Amino acid sequence: MRADMSVTSMLDREVYVYAEVDKLIGLPAGTAKRWINGYERGGKDHPPILRVTPGATPWVTWGEFVETRMLAEYRDRRKVPIVRQRAAIEELRARFNLRYPLAHLRPFLSTHERDLTMGGEEIGLPDAEVTIRTGQALLGDARWLASIATPGRDEVGEAVIVELPVDKAFPEIVINPSRYSGQPTFVGRRVSPVTIAQMVDGGEEREDLAADYGLSLKQIQDAIDYTKKYRLARLVAA
């Protein structure tokens, strides 16, 4: 990434293809594309949850990746109709005037400990008045992630997410689009946990790897466990 690239353009930076997003977040194959770009089934088009309209590009921007990661935290997403989820995202986008509302910190801070409400007419639903339990719950479920993500500032001072932990269980393994081509790395390091796990699998001593790469033995184990959990490489090391 160019040194003069703004945080805003970072959110618009094309970083991944859909299959990579599924793998990095741990989603079933095809999920990221459905959420981000919509899908067609039985001759019927289903609009995206996250994009305003479907696009022809095979690429996913950093802002879209962050939003997909946040949506993956929504515990009721299998119960709540897609139309309600999409409406909640649309309302957040309009209310905060943000292209990627789930990639900015302001919506998470603005709705903390209070309801976000909207009228049914605003989102095209028959309810006379809808409390956005969907939007509120989505923000609530993902708030832990927003609270520990690394923020940056855009040119107007908005706080946006520039680095995310890959998993609550592995807080020291992070994803940043400006480091290691957006692939997982350790905080403050440029080595991939997958590379570390593969070297252990290849017979390298953990103590030697820890010394060579400035990692703790716990981080070495985290690399192995993370790589196994997300099926990022074939491993036999325990």
UniProtKB/Swiss-Prot annotation:
Species name: Mycobacterium tuberculosis (strain ATCC 25618 / H37Rv)
Record-linked Gene3D superfamilies: Winged helix-like DNA-binding domain superfamily/Winged helix DNA-binding domain
InterPro entries cross-referenced by the UniProt entry: DUF433, Homeodomain-like_sf, VapB45-like, WH-like_DNA-bd_sf
Origin superkingdom: Bacteria
Protein name: Uncharacterized protein Rv2308
